[in-house]
Amino acid sequence: LGVEKDEHQAIGWYKKAAEQGHAVAQLNLGWIYANSPSRKNWEQAVYWYKQAAEQGDPRAQYNLAWCYGNGSGTPKNPRKAAYWYEEAAMQNHATAQYNLGWCYENGFGVEPDLDKALVWYHKSALQGQITAQYTLGWCYGNGRGMEVDMAKAVHWYTKAAEQGHTTAQLNLGWCHLNGKGTPVNREEALKWYLKAAEQGNATAMFNVGNCYAHGYGIEQDDKQAEEWYLKAVRHGNKKAASALRHLASKQEKEKKTDSED
């Protein structure tokens, strides 16, 4: 009841200020209408985001773009989404910059333009936006709109991985294991595979199993390999099931050899 009362009072104060043209109050009122379980009203959220966006508030511009892009509180309109993302991006809103890059890459509300997409991904990544950092790493690693440059791929994967991006951690582990863009470092590969695995990434779990099975970056340990393969199977990794069978077959052969000795 206390929270409900506080929210009711907040809406009252924000509304007074918003109606007098206060952009931050308009933004906050929009946010309440978009997020409050008891007062959710996307149409009102869009209305107030638009008021603040037209006054130049980059957060409101980003939120309004998101609403247009997702059809929340307003009919879906990719062109308006891209427009408002650009308005926010020009004011250095990092996630708006990433989303604008995505719009240009995918032709969402704008003509497809990979060069422009990469410019915006880069601006966003330099501000520390995690998805932009991963995406830029992937583009460098796969030659998407540029020459393949594995050293730059590793650079951007590392930035995203350090912020907890699971797929960046997985890909960074692969780079360290295979010496792509960085010298081979199996210990470092295992470190990043473990971080991704701890976040529930099934491929990383399988890769940790492989590290234990083959002694990559750690002492070879069939029992640990089996445990990680089982985790990977439980998370839907099909290769791990095959690896388990191979491991069981290997252990069976070793038992036979021991008994023959």
Give the location of each predicted region:
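Hydrophobic face of amphipathic alpha-helices that form TPR/SEL1-like repeat modules
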Residues: 3, 28-35, 63-70, 74, ...
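Terminal, low-structured helical/coil segments at or just beyond the last alpha-helical repeat
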Residues: 234-261
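Short helix-capping/linker turns of helical repeat alpha-solenoids
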Residues: 1, 6, 19-22, 35-36, ...
